[in-house]
Amino acid sequence: MAPYHIRQYQDSDHKSVVDVFTKGMEEHIPSTFRHMLMLPRTLLLLLGVPLALVLVSGSWLLAVVCIFFLLLLLRFLAGQPWKEYVATCLRTDMADITKSYLNAHGSFWVAESGNQVVGIVAALPVKDPPSGRKQLQLFRLSVSSQHRGQGIAKALVRTVLQFARDQGYTDVVLETSTLQQGAMTLYLGMGFQKTGQRFLTMFWRLVGIRTIQLKYPFPSA
């Protein structure tokens, strides 16, 4: 297990940070595809359309080709939301991390191992928190696949929690999805509590993938 340390982001980290973030998000595409394949409506589509073609044309070859193209379409649909999300982030906050986080009363940290960035996490103040609360939102948690299982993600979350304590925040909040079971297990194991859920878009509603809202409340002084 290679040693690692956590430090604040520097502009020279940008390319490596974008790489960790992009690969981390794109890893969700296969699991989204598998989730979609298991939906009853998807199974009905994959069986019903080819069977209808066989009944109409009498061609099993046409049915096989149809299944192949339906699978390609589903794979495209599974990947498109994640790719659009990455593209949006790279155009907005991830385009200038120093401006978006370090100069906006938040922070951005990297986990470094062997002179390589292997993990990232960010935090920003919540603009309109509930009355009487001062909340910090955790963003962009990701660890490269080769360095998982070493406690890096937990250490990055702890870094955000300590930053929030030091700055006098009452809560740390975040959002994740039902698809990201590893992240959900991590957060709940560290004391985060579920506070709500929603569908971000109509697509996510159709495929039954919810966004889960979580909160880590600090004890009152």
Curated annotation (Swiss-Prot):
Topology in the lipid bilayer: Single-pass membrane protein
One MF annotation (Gene Ontology) recorded for this entry: N-acetyltransferase activity
Source domain of life: Eukaryota
Keywords noted in UniProt: Acyltransferase, Developmental protein, Gastrulation, Membrane, Transferase, Transmembrane, Transmembrane helix
GO process annotations (BP): gastrulation with mouth forming second
Transmembrane segments: 53-73
Pfam families listed in its UniProt record: Acetyltransf_1
Family statement drawn from the similarity comment of this UniProt entry: Belongs to the camello family.
Protein name: N-acetyltransferase 8F1
Species this chain originates from: Rattus norvegicus (Rat)
Gene: Nat8f1
